[in-house]
């Protein structure tokens, strides 16, 4: 039965997989006829993309926290400084050419990926429910979901976790045709909401004891709130808010103002996350204590999740990206 279940989705997707395989033979991911690089050295890979190219978009280990704090490292690489920031006031004091150059390179993003359209944010509210689910649900589903999330996260680190990445590139079929290793986080973005729904089902079940619900809620809340408070009060001391590609490294006056802006963005997002987690925690507590009913609890949590995701997503996909015909 297990083999049949595994083969069914493979057969359903076989047309697109076979078409992709056929196309790849005529693309840059196919076997190369050129065996040397421009400098005369031997090419690293002849059957697919080379490791440096594959791992160019490797997620930073620390940067992975933007899964729950969207602008932990500044958000996307197109993020701009605030109009009322100290850096913007400094830019206004420059002449036109200098101001344009400084503004152009004043990036709030300080991660080490070359281009990031938007953070891979899954929602602090969903992550809180996911933590609650881990503590509440103890079955086979928890095991395979945690394994899938862990492997996906490690693979998304690419060159920052080279042992596993090199192993996959060298021995896993067609992995050397994978352009951006960070995109494998789609597995995380699928598994966390899925398990959150499983956890909610058990949390709302009458068969689950009140003490189980309260303990799960307490531990999830304490852990996440403690983590958020550590970042809020000590984050600016722990982190340096500098990337490996700082344009203004030789201009400390500009760099210090840019770091100050990054710290502001960081703390404002962390504070926002704290408010959302507290709202979720209070809502669940009121339900467990039978102060509010299940339907109202579900409605409030749904609205919190929608607000949490929408307020971030609208910064990257909004009416400015669309035009009327």
Regions found by a protein language model. Name each.
Residues 14-133, 234-273:
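Periplasmic/ER-lumenal interhelical loops and adjacent helix-loop junctions
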Residues 1-7, 137-325:
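Contiguous transmembrane helix-bundle modules in multi-pass membrane proteins
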């Amino acid at each position: 039965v297990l083999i049949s279940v595994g083969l069914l989705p493979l057969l359903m997707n076989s047309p697109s997989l076979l078409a992709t395989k056929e196309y790849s033979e005529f693309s840059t991911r196919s076997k190369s006829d050129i065996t040397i690089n421009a400098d005369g050295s031997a090419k690293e890979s002849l059957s697919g993309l080379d490791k440096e190219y594959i791992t160019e978009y490797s997620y930073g280990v620390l940067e992975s926290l933007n899964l729950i704090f969207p602008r932990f490292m500044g958000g996307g690489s197109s993020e701009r400084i605030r109009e009322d920031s100290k850096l913007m006031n400094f830019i206004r004091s420059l002449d036109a050419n200098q101001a344009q150059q400084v503004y152009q390179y004043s990036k709030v993003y300080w991660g080490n990926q070359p281009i990031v359209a938007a953070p891979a944010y899954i929602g602090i509210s969903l992550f809180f429910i996911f933590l609650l689910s881990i503590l509440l649900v103890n079955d086979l589903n928890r095991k395979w979901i945690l394994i899938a999330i862990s492997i996906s996260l490690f693979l998304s680190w690419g060159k920052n976790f080279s042992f596993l990445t090199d192993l996959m590139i060298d021995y896993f079929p067609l992995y050397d045709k994978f352009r951006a290793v960070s995109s494998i986080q789609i597995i995380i973005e699928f598994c966390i909401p899925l398990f959150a729904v499983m956890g909610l089902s058990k949390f709302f079940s009458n068969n689950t004891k009140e003490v189980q619900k309260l303990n799960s809620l307490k531990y999830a809340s304490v852990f996440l709130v403690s983590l958020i408070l550590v970042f809020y009060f000590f984050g600016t001391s722990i982190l340096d808010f500098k990337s490996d590609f700082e344009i203004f490294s030789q201009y400390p006056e500009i760099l210090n103002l840019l770091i100050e802006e990054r710290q502001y963005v960081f703390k404002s997002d962390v504070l926002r996350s704290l408010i959302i987690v507290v709202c979720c925690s209070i809502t669940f507590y009121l339900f467990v204590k039978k102060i509010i009913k299940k339907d109202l609890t579900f409605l409030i949590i749904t609205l919190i999740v929608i607000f949490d995701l929408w307020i971030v997503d609208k910064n990257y996909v909004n009416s400015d990206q669309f035009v009327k015909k």
